[in-house]
């Protein structure tokens, strides 16, 4: 089985699926039950500050929120929030350790830390996720739908949303204009 956890999936330019065209997906979990990830470059119109206000967390004083947008993390469980974040001293109710430095949290207790010193140093918030059944993603990779590259935190948290696809390709040393529109197999 391929090891895909903590990797980026980079949609090939010829990807025909409207949802995933030109997308970068961070793989949070990959095991013998399937694969789950978050699309990193499809921001919604909702800011994290607005999300906190809707959840009544902004009623607390002394909080500052950045202007980051909530991501459309994928077409599955679109009403559910997923927070990918750097390691914190605090533990949260529903967290999954992705790497030694990154966790995925789905419980609202993490949102209560936003705007405080207890918040993770870096985080992104997504509504929905992408998921694949066992061997489905490996089949899509074999069909040249995706490129795979080890993830890095700069692209995860610091690169503007609209530049993430190009930046992820650069991790492989590929300029987008060098892509062939067909792939061949020997």
UniProtKB/Swiss-Prot annotation:
Pfam families tied to this protein: DUF179 (PF02622)
Origin: domain of life: Bacteria
One Gene Ontology cellular component annotation held by this UniProt entry: cytosol
InterPro entries reported in the protein's UniProt record: AlgH-like (IPR003774)
Gene3D superfamilies: VC0467-like
Family: Belongs to the UPF0301 (AlgH) family.
PANTHER family attached to this UniProt entry: UNCHARACTERIZED PROTEIN YQGE, UPF0301 PROTEIN YQGE
Record's protein name: UPF0301 protein PM1869
């Amino acid at each position: 089985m391929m090891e895909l956890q903590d990797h980026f999936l980079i949609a090939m330019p010829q990807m025909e699926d409207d949802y995933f065209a030109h997308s970068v997906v961070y793989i949070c979990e990959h095991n013998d039950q399937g694969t789950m990830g978050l699309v990193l470059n499809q921001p919604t119109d909702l800011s994290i500050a607005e999300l906190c206000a809707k959840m009544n967390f902004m009623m607390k004083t002394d909080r500052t929120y950045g202007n980051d947008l909530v991501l459309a993390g994928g077409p599955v469980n679109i009403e559910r929030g997923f927070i990918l974040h750097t390691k914190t001293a605090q533990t949260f109710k529903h967290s999954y350790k992705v790497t030694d430095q990154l966790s995925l949290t789905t419980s609202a207790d993490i949102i209560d830390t936003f705007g405080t010193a207890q918040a993770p140093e870096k985080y992104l918030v997504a509504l929905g996720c992408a998921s694949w059944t066992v061997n489905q993603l490996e089949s899509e990779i074999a069909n040249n739908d995706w490129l795979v590259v080890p993830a890095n935190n700069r692209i995860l948290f610091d690169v503007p949303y609209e530049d993430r696809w190009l930046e992820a390709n650069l991790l492989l040393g590929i300029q987008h204009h060098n892509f062939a529109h067909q792939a061949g197999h020997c």
